[in-house]
């Protein structure tokens, strides 16, 4: 009996010591890049339903010159207003992925990049150039943007 107890305790200990499977961070980084590309296309086409699929319910967005947006409702309201703004030529919007880092655990990542969009002004069309960072979290097996912040370069 004593041998059985020792055997089972050893099995339990060894099972607990089994390392978690190694995450392929390169593949996960590629997933994040592809999500950012899909998000760019959704912005270009003003597809609000698609845009909203990229955010987690508690997502925080730090938009230039506005109060911090928290949660899907406030983020969606902001995108609706932005897409309705006829001075913003959304079909010209672009995002360039500069750097992607995925945590070793594979559940958190960030991406930095640059964005461009043409804007109508009283003096003609100007290029808005900016930069930003999105933080992604894997929730129930899916990557969702939990924090985004961006601003413009000096124009």
Predicted feature residues:
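Bacterial Sec-dependent N-terminal signal peptides
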Residues: 1-26
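Short, low-complexity N-terminal intrinsically disordered segments enriched in polar/charged residues
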Residues: 17-54
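Short beta-strand edge/turn micro-motifs at domain boundaries
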Residues: 21, 129-154
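A solvent-exposed, acidic/Ser-Thr-rich amphipathic alpha-helical stretch
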Residues: 26, 30, 48-107, 112-114, ...
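Short beta-strand segments enriched in hydrophobic/aromatic residues
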Residues: 55, 115-117, 149-152
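Beta-strand elements of well-folded, non-transmembrane domains
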Residues: 117-121, 136
């Amino acid at each position: 009996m004593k041998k059985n107890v020792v055997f089972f305790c050893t099995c339990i200990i060894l099972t607990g010591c089994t390392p978690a499977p190694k995450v392929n961070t390169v593949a996960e980084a590629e997933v994040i890049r592809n999500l950012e590309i899909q998000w760019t296309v959704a912005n270009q086409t003003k597809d609000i339903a698609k845009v909203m699929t990229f955010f987690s319910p508690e997502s925080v967005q730090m938009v230039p010159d506005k109060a911090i947006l928290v949660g899907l409702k406030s983020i969606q309201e902001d995108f609706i207003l932005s897409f309705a703004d006829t001075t913003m030529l959304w079909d010209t919007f672009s995002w360039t992925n500069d750097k992607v880092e995925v945590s070793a655990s594979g559940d958190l990542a960030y991406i930095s990049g640059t964005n461009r969009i043409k804007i109508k002004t009283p003096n003609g069309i100007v290029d808005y150039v900016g930069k930003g960072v999105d933080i992604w979290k894997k929730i129930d097996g899916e990557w969702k943007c939990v924090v985004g912040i961006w601003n413009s370069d000096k124009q």
